Amino acid sequence: MKRIGILGAGTWGMALARMLTVSGNDVLVWSAIEKEIDSLSTTRKHPNLPQMKIPDELRFTKNIEEVCKDKDILLFAVPSVFVRSTAAKARPYVADGQIIVDVAKGIEPDTLYTMTEILADELGKEGGPKGVRLVALSGPTHAEEVAIDLPTTIVSASPDVEAAQFVQEVFSNSVMRVYTNEDIKGVELSGAMKNVIALGVGISTGLGYGDNARAALITRGIAEIARLGVAMGCNVHTFAGLAGIGDLIVTATSMHSRNNRAGILIGKGET
């Protein structure tokens, strides 16, 4: 049994929290929204995951120090725009050498940092830990499916191979297969850039175009992402894997995908 602290109680954070709890881990979830914590702990239901029952063993807290202290893994599951501010709040309580897992996807506009680069920057400031072990967890994963134990694959990415393998071991179970990859930059870049292509695919659908156009956008889209990644020092093979083409396919084709749905509405002229 591992002790896991999760910062963020959105759909992805809660789907993972349930999965990790069912696997026998001691999981504690924190949210900056106190009403959210009250509702989740009382109703044992998440409003955006109606089919998911929150296990009685899964615990909640409003205290950020409590969620950070004495944990084998500290998982950041807040939206990308809140990763830096949440890291700043957590900084005084993060232990030296702590394994930090990020599941948010995106690029910070002002710095062009990936999410783990933001965490390294913010946690490295005065009053923070003396080094952390950063892992990005990314792939073709909709929370709606993980929440009801549908088969899923994901990538644990870090240049720290031992940390990536530790996360692989903790998150693996009968319905979740975890692969490792040392190319954390490529994995994170894939997770951010696929949203742009998925939006375009949705727009093409909304305009009434067919499968031919969607296939072209997905295929040429991953080629563009790969070229950008290689120029930034990433491994080209990353983009042909789960975190690359895999994540792009699921985001560009599924109605679970907000980017796909938004694109469809744009294409129809409804937004």
Each language-model region and where it sits:
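Internal alpha-helical scaffold of NAD(P)-dependent oxidoreductase catalytic cores
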Residues: 82, 93, 118, 125-133, ...
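Histidine/acidic-rich helix-loop-helix segments that form or flank divalent-metal centers
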Residues: 239, 245
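NAD(P)+-binding Rossmann beta1-loop-alpha1 motif at the extreme N-terminus of oxidoreductases
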Residues: 1-53, 59-62, 89
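Glycine-rich phosphate/pyrophosphate-binding beta-alpha loops
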Residues: 142-143, 205, 248-255
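Divalent-cation-assisted or electrostatically stabilized phosphate/pyrophosphate-binding catalytic cores
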Residues: 254-271
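Rossmann-like NAD(P)(H) cofactor-binding subdomain of soluble oxidoreductases
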Residues: 54, 61-69, 73-149, 167
